């Protein structure tokens, strides 16, 4: 792997050197370089430096320009603009040579690995045992999966944790019913995901009906909770059946979502049972938690309720039971002390923000989250229906995730079939899954995670606008051009002058690495999605204005094929980081 310095970084280094040469006391000053509509880049840092040194900004800018060599391999021209801005134009040769180095690097496209890589534990995709996954589970899974891929690509080590809901009082009801009705759940290995969920739903509804009408059964169910929590083998065996059958279902849904879930990363609430008493004991001994009305709680002066009373975090209830806080705090101890995490990232509903704020502060007070560990709650918004309210079925029920994905694939099949020229029905169905699932993911990921968004399948599978289908068709179009080129191979020709559309495309291709790093560092997959949409848009402009196979000279044909090839590889790599497929033909 040979990392490639981006053009923006190279220009930044040149400007920093010129600033230091002009004003030695300004060593280390930031030129504040950014992309510009007036030139390739604009530097605004001279204004702050002029103010600091009490110099005239335009005169200082002119001095800096005099220190910059233009017409060389990198910078073609520099102009002073406005009150003291620098407008910088990069040489065509530099753009092509830089992109050629990226293409030669293979899959990483010249993007370096971060030097200060740590270990991030990503807590995402947390369904509940014995319950169907619904539209509310979509965002945690899709966002978490994309963030892991992006962090991995930068060089960070990531460990996934699926904190599934596999513990609680509801299992007393379920297990007692199964104990009294043996054989209701088939062995997990004998069924598929749909059958597993059907069985679990049947048992849940039947047990709930008995629980709500039979007081004696209700009492037996409560005793079963005690048996479960005390580790009774017979009870645990039946509980394990529910967990195993639920996993079969989970895997089927995640497979449909085109996500890899590793069994060893499914670590539910139950995994922390043994550690929760110690967590409570340590918090009480340290004085972080105190007894209040029989419960063990943590108070926060700055967090108050409507009556201006402190809102407590309940670690242990008055009856001795443990809640979510004890489980989450025990998980933090495990992830920091045993997994050696330097960052804890939670991809959870924004409505849990207060809970995690209190959990993190408690862990800080206890010393379990030291200065060397960062904990971040990336709360996400709600998926809305067309009416702007939380997405429901027409009957007012929560939308099943499987139904939503199936409909997306079905709608995508209509789009693919309409555009298909030489695809068989099997190929259409294969592409439909890639397009439909990609459309659902992209609609989510192209939205800032903390914002709500409307689930609109018509827009999601549209060929126009900011959709994954638009990106996929751009990729497929490039593959078609490369096939039509036959024996003519892509080749970079730095000696050629570039068309304006070629320059715009080339400069954007060069920004792939910095964009991925920024999106990963800010946990902002929507920034990568926006980059890819702009890339496809710039390619469309290039395609319209710059004939590829009918270019004026053989060298120009090769150079434009080279730009096509690198664009396709960048689209493929970027969309893969978002968990979206790029079909070669559509």
UniProtKB/Swiss-Prot annotation:
Sections of the chain in a coiled coil: none
EC nos: 6.1.1.19
InterPro entries: aa-tRNA-synth_I_CS, Arg-tRNA-ligase, Arg-tRNA-synth_N, Arg-tRNA-synth_N_sf, ArgRS_core, DALR_anticod-bd, Rossmann-like_a/b/a_fold, tRNAsynth_Ia_anticodon-bd
Pfam families noted in UniProt: Arg_tRNA_synt_N, DALR_1, tRNA-synt_1d
GO terms, molecular function: arginine-tRNA ligase activity; ATP binding
HAMAP family to which the protein is assigned, alphabetical: Arg_tRNA_synth (MF_00123)
UniProt name for this protein: Arginine--tRNA ligase
């Amino acid at each position: 792997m040979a990392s490639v310095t981006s053009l923006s970084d190279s220009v930044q280094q040149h400007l920093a050197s010129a600033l230091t040469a002009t004003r030695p006391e300004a060593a280390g000053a930031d030129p504040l370089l950014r992309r510009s509509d007036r030139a390739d880049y604009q530097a605004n840092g001279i204004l702050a430096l002029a103010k600091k040194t009490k110099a005239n900004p335009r005169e200082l800018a002119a001095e800096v320009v005099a220190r910059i060599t233009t017409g060389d391999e990198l910078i073609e021209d520099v102009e002073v603009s406005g009150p003291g801005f620098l407008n910088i134009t990069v040489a065509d040769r530099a753009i092509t040579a830089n992109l050629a180095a990226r293409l030669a690097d293979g899959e990483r496209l010249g993007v370096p690995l971060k030097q200060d890589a740590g270990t991030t534990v990503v807590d995402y995709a947390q369904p509940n045992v014995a319950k169907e996954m619904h539209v509310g589970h979509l965002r945690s899974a899709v966002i978490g999966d994309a963030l892991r891929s992006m962090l991995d690509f930068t060089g960070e080590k990531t460990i996934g944790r699926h904190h599934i809901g596999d513990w609680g009082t509801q299992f007393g009801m379920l297990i007692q019913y199964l104990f009294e009705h043996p054989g209701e759940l088939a062995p997990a290995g004998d069924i598929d995901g749909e059958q597993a969920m059907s069985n679990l739903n049947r048992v849940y509804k039947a047990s709930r009906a008995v629980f709500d009408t039979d007081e004696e059964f209700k009492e037996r169910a409560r005793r079963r909770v005690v048996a479960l929590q005390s580790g009774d083998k017979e009870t645990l065996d039946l509980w394990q059946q529910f967990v195993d059958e639920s996993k079969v279902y989970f895997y089927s849904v995640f497979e449909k979502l085109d996500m890899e879930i590793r069994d060893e990363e499914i670590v539910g609430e139950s995994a922390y049972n043994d550690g929760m008493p110690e967590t409570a004991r340590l918090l009480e001994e340290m004085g972080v938690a105190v007894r209040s009305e029989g419960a063990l709680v943590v108070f926060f002066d700055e967090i108050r309720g409507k009556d201006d009373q402190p809102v407590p975090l309940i670690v242990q209830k008055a009856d001795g039971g443990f809640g979510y806080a004890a489980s989450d705090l025990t998980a933090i101890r495990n992830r920091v002390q045993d997994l050696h995490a330097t960052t804890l990232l939670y991809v959870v509903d924004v409505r849990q923000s207060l809970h995690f704020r209190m959990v993190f502060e408690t862990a800080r007070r206890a010393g379990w989250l030291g200065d060397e560990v960062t904990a971040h709650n990336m709360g996400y918004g709600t998926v809305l229906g067309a009416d702007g309210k939380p997405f429901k079925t027409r009957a007012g029920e929560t939308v099943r995730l499987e139904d939503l994905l199936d409909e997306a694939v079905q709608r995508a099949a209509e789009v693919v079939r309409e555009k298909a020229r030489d695809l068989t029905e099997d190929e259409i169905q294969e592409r439909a899954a890639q397009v439909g699932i990609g459309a659902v993911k992209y609609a989510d990921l192209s939205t800032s995670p903390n914002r709500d968004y409307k689930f609109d399948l018509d827009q999601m599978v549209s060929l126009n606008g900011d959709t994954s289908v638009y990106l996929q068709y751009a990729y497929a179009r490039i593959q078609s051009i490369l096939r039509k080129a036959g024996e003519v191979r892509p080749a970079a020709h730095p000696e050629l002058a570039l068309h304006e559309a070629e320059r715009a495309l080339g400069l954007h291709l060069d920004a792939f690495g910095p964009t991925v790093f920024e999106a990963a560092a800010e946990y902002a997959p929507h920034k990568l999605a926006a980059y890819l949409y702009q890339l496809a848009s710039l390619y469309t402009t290039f395609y319209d204005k710059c004939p590829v196979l009918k270019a004026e000279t053989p060298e120009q044909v090769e150079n434009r094929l080279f730009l096509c090839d690198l664009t396709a590889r960048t689209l493929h790599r970027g969309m893969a980081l978002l968990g979206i497929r790029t079909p070669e033909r559509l």
